[in-house]
């Protein structure tokens, strides 16, 4: 997964409030066993994650994950310095242009996947992150993408 998603990778992030879903595209970075998103505490996604941590990620290449999200804090918090370093490198072309670390409401969201599907080199992988199992099978991505 690090090979595919351990870089700036765009997903649609879905959250929900009062059983009403909301989706938006976000830049993510996968590190360790989690996806990370840079955002603002007052954004709709952060507010919804605070109330309901159940989220999903998907992209047009059919990679999809469900999991639990948590706001892990402000980027200048020393406890998350290691992930900040990784995020500033992964998002180098735009990180400091679009984020203000002097803003006390800037934050990172960590998404710990519980289940997911991705494919690479003709193999599909169905993952259960909770049970730490993976099922591999032949897979051809033959969806015609329409812009």
Regions found by a protein language model. Name each.
Residues 2-5, 17-20, 27-29, 47-48:
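Short secondary-structure boundary/capping segments within folded domains
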Residues 9, 24, 53, 105-107:
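Residue-level marker for the onset of beta-strands and adjacent loop->beta junctions
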Residues 29-63:
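A short mixed-secondary-structure module that forms the rim of ligand-binding clefts
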Residues 21, 35-36, 116:
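Hydrophobic residues embedded in beta-strands of well-ordered beta-sheets
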Residues 64, 68-147:
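Charged, gly/pro-rich active-site loop segments
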Residues 10-11, 23, 27-34:
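Short, basic, glycine/proline-bearing loop/turn elements
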């Amino acid at each position: 997964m690090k090979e595919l998603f351990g870089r700036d990778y765009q997903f649609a992030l879905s959250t929900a409030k009062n059983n009403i879903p909301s989706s938006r595209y976000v830049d993510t970075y996968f590190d360790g066993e989690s996806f990370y998103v840079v955002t603002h505490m007052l954004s709709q996604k952060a507010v919804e994650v605070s109330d309901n941590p159940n989220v999903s990620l998907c992209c047009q290449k059919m990679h999809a994950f469900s999991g639990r999200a948590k706001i892990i804090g402000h980027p200048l918090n020393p406890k998350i310095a290691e992930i900040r370093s990784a995020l500033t490198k992964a998002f180098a072309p735009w990180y400091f242009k679009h984020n203000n670390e002097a803003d006390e409401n800037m934050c990172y969201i960590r998404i710990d996947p519980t289940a997911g599907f991705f494919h690479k080199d003709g193999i599909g992988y169905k993952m259960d992150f909770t049970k730490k199992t993976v099922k591999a099978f032949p897979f051809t991505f033959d969806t015609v993408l329409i812009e």
